[in-house]
Amino acid sequence: RGVDTDWLNEPLRFAVSQRHNLFIEGGDQTFRYGVGANIGKTQGVMKGSDRQTANGNIRLIYRKGQFSFTNNMNFDYTEADQESVAFSEFAKANPYMRKYDADGNVVKMLGYDYYENPIYSPMYNWSNNNINNSRTTGFTNNFEAEWRPMEELRARVKLGIRNTNSRGKIFKSP
């Protein structure tokens, strides 16, 4: 048929990332604090894939005499959308097959493989309402206490906890 279909060009895009940060700190010699937040969005090179992140943190430091106490808290959130059709499906598509029919509609089936199994167009699979996303929230708290009875000797205790919740959703239209 003389078709020279560039299947690899279809799912790709020029991706842009952005990130914004804010950090405020202050206090005196006894008590110091820091509060920060950042957000970001990263596009994937595959159309339909991206990642959004948000993070907040609080740092508190208390120093009095021989004692020092530090607490760091972090909250984070990530939402990610994955491409609904793998790039490998586009890479495997035959360049002699057409993407669209004579009416301009996406071709559903490209043909059959050696075992007579249907080969579906990645463009058709891509046009379905497929979903592949995930959300993750996390909390981290690190606490440290230090005692310095003399300059050459110190005792330190560190405690930390981490909690992460992830939820994903995958739906592929038949």
Placement of each model-derived feature along the sequence:
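Surface-exposed loop/interface segments of Gram-negative outer-membrane beta-barrel transport/assembly proteins
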Residues: 1-3, 44-49, 55-140, 156-174
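Short strand-turn segments of transmembrane beta-barrel domains in outer membranes
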Residues: 1-23, 33-46
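Solvent-exposed, well-ordered amphipathic alpha-helical segments
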Residues: 1, 18-20, 26-28, 71, ...
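An active-site-proximal structural segment forming one wall of the substrate-binding cleft
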Residues: 153
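Outer-membrane beta-barrel channels and translocator barrels
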Residues: 17, 28-29, 63-67, 148-150
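Outer-membrane beta-barrel architecture
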Residues: 23-25, 36, 58-59, 142-144, ...
